[in-house]
Amino acid sequence: MTTWYFLNSGKCSPSFNMALDEALLDWHSEGLIPPVIRFYEWEPATLSIGYFQQAKKDINLDAVREQGLGFVRRPTGGRAVLHEHELTYSVIVTESYPDMPESVTEAYRVLSEGILQGFHNLGMDAYFSVPDTEEKRADLKSPKSAVCFDAPSWYELVVEGKKIAGSAQTRQKGVILQHGAILLDLDQEKLLSVFNFSSEEAKDRMRRKLPEKAVAINSLVDEPVTVEQCVTAFRDGFAKSLQIELKPFTLSEEQLEYVRALEEKKYACDEWNFKK
């Protein structure tokens, strides 16, 4: 059985979280570490935006600051995510890994099997979304809003037809980095408050639409699920779906210095976060 590293970082700053994901990609590309499954949280609660999003156009930055939220641009695509009551995961693995599909969409499905299995471990009837109409496929090419949980993409996880986990992917240096948010709870009004809308009517439409499109774990269970329970369920889910053994990984001081330098140079800088 192949051994991967497993890293549970706990609560970290937004800039450190993104720097560590990129550092893991760098080290794996250089053959210094095996593939990695990482779990983490955010301190403070943070709005992350996709690599291609326009921060000043899409985001109400005054509301972000007024609510004391962190803000960071991800190295991956996709739309904006409010990271608050959730567990975030990342998977770092070479594109040439055995049986890894070349297609971005199919690789996404393979890596997301661990998330699917994690939901099943929690006793939830989750399944992959597959856009089955021309309208849904068109929405993926030209999304109507900047909100990630507005609609599921190919092979994202849904329960009762509603999106419960959103993910994004990038490929650099021959390595896949996929990370995503697993929602425990969803504060709809806080989420809506940090986006710019063309009008109050547009915001009201999203307010009505969101409960039909997105759902969080604790709104579907009788007893609240903790982050610790999620860590166990999804760690075991990845181990089973990828048929791997997970070995705990702790960063060395030298590795921590590398992450902090990358954080300072890139993810903590306005030049990166507001460049579009």
UniProtKB/Swiss-Prot annotation:
<dbReference type="GO" id="GO:0036211">
    <property type="term" value="P:protein modification process"/>
</dbReference>
<comment type="similarity">
    <text>Belongs to the octanoyltransferase LipM family.</text>
</comment>
<dbReference type="GO" id="GO:0009107">
    <property type="term" value="P:lipoate biosynthetic process"/>
</dbReference>
<comment type="subunit">
    <text>Monomer.</text>
</comment>
<dbReference type="InterPro" id="IPR004143">
    <property type="entry name" value="BPL_LPL_catalytic"/>
</dbReference>
<keyword id="KW-0808">Transferase</keyword>
<feature type="domain" description="BPL/LPL catalytic">
    <location>
        <begin position="31"/>
        <end position="246"/>
    </location>
</feature>
<feature type="site" description="Lowers pKa of active site Cys">
    <location>
        <position position="163"/>
    </location>
</feature>
<comment type="function">
    <text>Catalyzes the transfer of endogenously produced octanoic acid from octanoyl-acyl-carrier-protein onto the lipoyl domain of GcvH, an intermediate carrier during protein lipoylation.</text>
</comment>
<dbReference type="InterPro" id="IPR024898">
    <property type="entry name" value="LipM"/>
</dbReference>
<comment type="pathway">
    <text>Protein modification; protein lipoylation via endogenous pathway; protein N(6)-(lipoyl)lysine from octanoyl-[acyl-carrier-protein].</text>
</comment>
<protein>
    <recommendedName>
        <fullName>Octanoyltransferase LipM</fullName>
        <ecNumber>2.3.1.181</ecNumber>
    </recommendedName>
</protein>
<keyword id="KW-0012">Acyltransferase</keyword>
<dbReference type="GO" id="GO:0033819">
    <property type="term" value="F:lipoyl(octanoyl) transferase activity"/>
</dbReference>
<feature type="active site" description="Acyl-thioester intermediate">
    <location>
        <position position="148"/>
    </location>
</feature>
<dbReference type="InterPro" id="IPR045864">
    <property type="entry name" value="aa-tRNA-synth_II/BPL/LPL"/>
</dbReference>
<dbReference type="InterPro" id="IPR050664">
    <property type="entry name" value="Octanoyltrans_LipM/LipL"/>
</dbReference>
<dbReference type="Pfam" id="PF21948">
    <property type="entry name" value="LplA-B_cat"/>
</dbReference>
